[in-house]
């Protein structure tokens, strides 16, 4: 259950309706063909958890999200633009008009036709923007943008952004006839929405939070000039464009300066757009500690922990929990572990690498190929070093939060070696609930390194020899040093929790509102 006890809304924003926009929402629906019943399940991920806390705390907040196909589209069609009240405290359910729930979330679903959504999400948002922003393209061969890609941008990405903007504008006008409201947009799916909303509702307070890395101008030159200009101009419709790190915020301003020719103020971290000033800010996202602990100490988690203890005995646990996304750098992680075991045979039988991996986007060829590489890499390590009594890699392709939190509690080293990562909440989750003074082996390219790097063993994501050495340092670190590092890292995460992440954003918008 998300902790919705967010810091109070600043007085300057009291009475202003709040509209949130994200691609995924807090709940999704399925149709059970056997019973004929409609079932609902909670949305997953750090963004959904964070926004659930905010939406549940604000009585007048409405969360706008996409319904593209299946039962979600059926629910959206039945709602016909009406706001649904959804109780998320137990099994998600839509409340009647007079139904009572504990802090229900108000939801508005945007119907996006399946063909539009496929072009928007399956051609532009993921294979193009995600790859560009994580610098995953092999530029010798990809991307190779043809007329189909251009059509996908115009008829898919632009159209989906228009539909989302129309829903946001309709909600603003319904809740605030004077057009004064707070609109908080999220992530790479909706870069064009800010300017579209600004054109229709010039008096709204608009923020856009980008949850993935923002590279510099050279990376954005992968997009043709008119496409990258649409992206940047869409974001500049907002009052605040926010990122996880100062580095990403500066990179955004450099893009605005070099690709649009606008004058930026790097000291004030802002750019003037006509009569408006647009601010670039860094707000590192965090976790809902209470919700995490609720899962970590559940009956299911306790059973998983007992099973892990029985499996491991006295062995140390090296852990990673990731999606099978190429940006997570999983194959290099196995290569580094292989080198570690080759150079340090004394570790044989003394460590197990549990890799909990959730298969991701298997309809994208690069992702399907990467999952096959992962399986081959894990099998190779086991074949080279395993014995009848000990398998060095325990590969589990599943998503199980109870098991993940049990592994967080039991692990000795957590491996995060991403080539690019906006934040990486796994690092923060593990630090908070771990019971063995774990060592965080953390990529310098993960946003979490800005907060936790001082207490971690830093990894270079492309240097597997360095990663092997770092893993050895982590596994053999002095117990007292482990204890001190872990204690301080946990304090940082508990202090900078999701409530603080939300409150600093609202405080910034409140200051802008007062200055108008």
Model-predicted regions and their roles:
Residues 2-516:
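Catalytic cores of carbohydrate-active enzymes across secretory and cytosolic contexts
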């Amino acid at each position: 259950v998300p902790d919705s006890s967010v810091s109070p809304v600043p007085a300057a924003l009291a009475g202003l309706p709040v509209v949130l926009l994200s691609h995924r929402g807090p709940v999704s629906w399925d149709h059970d063909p056997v019973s004929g019943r409609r079932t609902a399940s909670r949305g997953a991920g750090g963004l959904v958890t964070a926004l659930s806390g905010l939406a549940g705390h604000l009585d007048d907040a409405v969360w706008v999200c996409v319904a593209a196909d299946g039962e979600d589209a059926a629910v959206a069609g039945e709602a016909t633009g009406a706001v649904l009240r959804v109780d998320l405290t137990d099994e998600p359910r839509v409340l009647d008009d007079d139904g009572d729930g504990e802090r229900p979330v108000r939801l508005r679903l945007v119907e996006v036709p399946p063909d539009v959504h496929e072009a928007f999400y399956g051609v532009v948002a993921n294979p193009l923007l995600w790859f560009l922003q994580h610098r995953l393209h092999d530029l010798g061969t990809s991307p190779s943008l043809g007329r189909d890609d251009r059509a996908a941008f115009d008829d898919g990405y632009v159209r989906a952004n228009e539909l989302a903007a129309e829903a946001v504008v309709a909600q603003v006008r319904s809740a605030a006839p004077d057009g004064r409201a707070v609109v908080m947009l999220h992530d790479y799916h909706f870069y064009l929405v800010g300017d579209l909303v600004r054109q229709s509702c010039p008096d709204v307070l608009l923020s856009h939070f980008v949850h993935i890395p923002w590279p510099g101008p050279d990376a954005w030159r992968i997009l043709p000039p008119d496409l990258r200009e649409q992206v940047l101009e869409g974001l500049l419709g907002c009052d605040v464009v926010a990122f996880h790190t100062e580095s990403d915020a500066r990179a955004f301003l450099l893009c605005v300066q070099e690709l649009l020719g606008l004058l930026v103020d790097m000291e004030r971290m802002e750019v003037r757009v006509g009569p408006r000033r647009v601010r670039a800010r860094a707000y590192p996202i965090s976790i809902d500690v209470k919700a995490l602990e609720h899962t970590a100490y559940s009956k299911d988690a306790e059973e998983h922990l007992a099973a892990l203890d029985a499996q491991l005995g006295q062995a140390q646990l090296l852990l990673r929990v990731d999606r099978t996304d190429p940006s997570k750098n999983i194959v290099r992680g196995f290569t580094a572990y292989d080198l570690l075991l080759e150079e340090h045979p004394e570790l044989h039988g003394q460590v197990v690498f549990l890799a909990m991996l959730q298969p991701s986007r298997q309809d994208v060829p690069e992702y399907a190929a990467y999952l096959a590489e992962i399986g081959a890499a894990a099998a190779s390590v086991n074949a080279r070093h395993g014995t009848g009594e000990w398998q060095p890699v325990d590969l589990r392709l599943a998503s199980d939060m109870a098991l993940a939190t049990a592994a967080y509690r039991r692990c000795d080293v957590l491996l995060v070696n991403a080539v690019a990562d906006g934040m990486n909440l796994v690092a923060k989750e593990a630090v908070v609930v771990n019971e063995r003074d774990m060592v965080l082996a953390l990529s310098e390219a993960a946003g979490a390194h800005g907060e936790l790097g001082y207490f971690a063993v830093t990894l270079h994501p492309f240097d597997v020899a360095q990663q092997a050495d770092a893993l050895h340092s982590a596994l053999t670190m002095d117990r007292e040093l482990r204890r001190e590092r872990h204690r301080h890292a946990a304090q940082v995460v508990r202090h900078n929790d999701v409530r603080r992440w939300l409150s600093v954003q609202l405080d910034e918008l409140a200051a802008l509102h007062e200055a108008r």
